[in-house]
Amino acid sequence: MNQSQAPVGVFDSGVGGLSVLREIRQLLPNESLLYVADSGHVPYGEKSAEYIRERCVLITEHLLAQGAKALVLACNTATAAAAAELRERYPQLPIVGMEPAVKPAAAATRSGVVGVLATTGTLKSAKFAALLDRFASDVRVITQPCPGLVECIEAGALQAPATRELLQGYVEPLLAEGCDTLILGCTHYPFLKPLLHSLVPDSVSLIDTGAAVARQLQRLLGQHELLATQPAQATRYWSSGDIQRMQAVLPLLLGEQAQVHVF
């Protein structure tokens, strides 16, 4: 098989990375995609870095065995915990990670107050601290860990009253502090944008990094002469959690039905 027609492997702690997969599809419609949801171990945000690294190596090995030509860590927590080790272990493999959009948010804010919704793991990471030091020295950044939100999205409860109540509790303190720019620092959270728009004023910008990750993948594949030129094959999905549940949320999150395999 021509290496440029090989698939790109994408993975996340659960279904959140599908928000990134959606952006990759839009920008790179010829790329065939493989997706692993590690839903049997979700959420990563509450796990140790060592545990997350072990999971990431297992998943990467699986994706390489399926012929992946590149890897997208569609998870902020996994990137913070494991990207450096994966790049060291697989030096020939183009790897794209993700980080909360601190730089664009610091540039966008008018009030000088930026809110960050993320998992505990991302907010505690050295990588996040370094991002704040580098890009947010002139703005006030208020971080808000969001336990429970990932689980709501995994269950497909995007508009449920309980999800709304939880999200409102996380967002209101940020708005009270004058925050006008909200970073969605977890790939699950873009699926809550419709709900968020109903909870925050129109003047508040919501910033996530899915599109930026797709552009970085495009750059890396181009550098390695790996951009696909033929139409994509159907996306293949795996989950380490409840297969039926993932099959049920795919139409909600991506508008498609697909078979999910056991990982």
Curated annotation (Swiss-Prot):
Q: What's the superkingdom here?
A: Bacteria
Q: One GO biological process from the UniProt record?
A: cell wall organization
Q: Which UniProt keywords apply?
A: Cell shape, Cell wall biogenesis/degradation, Isomerase, Peptidoglycan synthesis
> Which molecular function terms from Gene Ontology are attached?
glutamate racemase activity
What this protein is reported to do is described as:
Provides the (R)-glutamate required for cell wall biosynthesis.
HAMAP family, sorted = Glu_racemase
Sorted alphabetically, which NCBIfam families does this protein's record hold?
Answer: glut_race (TIGR00067)
Q: What is this protein called?
A: Glutamate racemase
> Per the UniProt entry, what species is this protein from, by scientific name?
Ectopseudomonas mendocina (strain ymp) (Pseudomonas mendocina)
